[in-house]
Each structure stands twice: as C-alpha cells, then as structure tokens.
Amino acid sequence: MNVKEAIRERRSIRDFKSDKVKKEDLDLILEAARLAPSGTNLQPWRFVVVESDEMREKLRGCTLDFVGDAPVTIVCCVDYKALEEMNDRLKELQEVGALKGTALEKIDPSKYKGRKMSEEDIKRYLHLNLSIAIENMALQATELGLGSCWLMMFNEKKLSQILNLDDNLEAVALLPIGYGSDNPAPRPRLSLDRIVIDRV
C-alpha cells in the first residue's frame, strides 16, 4: 500500500475486534510518530501506550466506551518542557545543514529565543506539531491493516490522574488502535471546489 492508498483507505474505526495488536506493528506505528516533522525539529510529542485490561477499563471512565474495547490506545501528549530544548534542536538542524540559505543558518543557537508567543499561541503550536505525528500513526496503522480513531472527547483531568502524568505533559488526543469489526464505506468529503478558496 502506498501513501495515496493509505490516505484513501483510512477510516475512523469505532468497533474493534478483541484481537491483540502485534508488538512489531505497534512499534512501527510509534516509529511513524517519531519520524514526523515538527517546527524547529522540536518533537514535543510524548505517548502513553495503554494495553492492559485494567487500564483500558479505566479509560472507559473518562472517554467514549468504545475506546476501552480497542486492544491498544495511544494517549497522545505534548511536553511543554520540550520548549526548553529549542536551542539544542536548532543546533542539530544547523549541524546537518537543514537550515542552509535561511536566516537561521548562522544564528547562535544559544541566543535563539524563537518568535514571541503568548501561552495560547504556544499551546496551539505544540498541538499542531503533535497532530502531524498522530496522522502519521493513523496512516501507518492503515497500511498494516489496522483501524484507528483519532478523538479528543475525554476528561483530561481524570485521564491525567489515571495515568499519573507529570505537570509538564498535556494529554491532547486518544488514538485507539485495533482490527475493525467491519469495513466502513468512505465518508463524504467536500469537493476541491469547496475547499480551495483561490489559486493566485
């Protein structure tokens, strides 16, 4: 399956079989997240893999029931401490020549502060970066014949307590993964004419 096929075949699966996900498949899915691009190569994503029956049952108490039916759920978090490593990430990009020809090519990484952002902007920035990693995982799962469902409907405070997340971590999304009980039809999508505002 190529990327185009994975994009076309991916569906949000809400009815999972009880079959376990193979460890090697789960590792490939997590590796797809690890390889995702991010602003300044910040890589602010952190993941908690929920597989045990006990923890899956606890998940039901803070999100939709079907999440507990999935054999594995990846809790997708952002790490606000990642911002403290921005200078290190910038230096790495300089060392591999990724910033050649840009204003950041010769800047002193130790003095780089990035653009000034409000707390809301920082949150949005980290969430957007995490989103890329989540979609990578969803597409990798599809290629492996697995279903997933990216959702943000959960009680964040309760989930953080259940998982004992550090204060610097924010759970942003859940990605239950498993073998779908059925093969749902393609969902309706808007036409290109509706979504492309202009070509200038």
Report the location of each language-model feature.
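Acidic, surface-exposed loops and disordered segments
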Residues: M1-V200
